Amino acid sequence: MLLDIQDLDVSFRTDEGEVVRAAVDVNLTLDRGEVLGLVGESGSGKSSVAMSVARLLPSPPAFYPKGRVLFDGRDVLKMSLPELRAIRGRRIGVVFQDPIGSLSPLHRIGAQLVETIRLHADISGAAAKAMALDWLGKVGIPEPAVRAEAYPHELSGGMQQRVMIAMALMLEPDLVIADEPTTALDVTVQAQVLRLMRDLHRANSAVLIITHDLGVVSQMATKLAVMRQGRVVETADDPAAFFASPQHPYSQALVREARRMELD
């Protein structure tokens, strides 16, 4: 099993010393060739769980009262910082919900992509640049050579999101964590990006998609989990069966709302 989350609690300590429980007793598994859709409304805890997989939550204020996050048999929560840096990017790629907060404002887009590639792959600068431009094209960015010379603030939100997606996918990691990956994208580019992610999991990688969009889940997921108020309330190994007959009242409400929006 590539990813095995066991009895995970994620909590945050406020400035006043209060403890807020973001996720409680979460158990999830994800193997190579699978796509897990983790769905729920804002504040349900899904992003806290997903970011814990690569231990990306700031600590403090985040902490883990109990549980394990096993990635390829090793507990991420017990890894040293050098061990974490070795797997982030190369073995675990992350598409963040807020791209502008994840890209350096001081460096050009192309330079950031090249740096990421050369940090994890033993290739020349020229080869890394060619690879970066190729991936900018793959995620639907026109004139990749021109855009590569831009700074993040010179790109639209949708363009920034596509850069983040290229950065996460280009090293073909074992696991991709995508937090609302298509929110800022138009329908055409969204389809293009989802196709790239499908190709990746078919190449024996795993994908964890965090979203409130059940349409994305229906297109992508091979299994899904529904979160509400920090807890997993329903899981399904057959998404089609889930959409046909969700069991938990909250899941039923989500599916009803998705159908209503389709009709609108």
Regions found by a protein language model. Name each.
Residues 64-75, 234:
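Conserved ABC transporter NBD signature motif
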Residues 217-219:
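A short, surface-exposed alpha-helical micro-motif characterized by mixed small hydrophobic
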Residues 150-155, 159:
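Conserved ABC ATPase signature
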Residues 170-174:
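A short, proline-enriched helix->beta-strand linker immediately N-terminal to the Walker B motif
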Residues 191-203:
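Helical segment within the ABC ATPase nucleotide-binding domain
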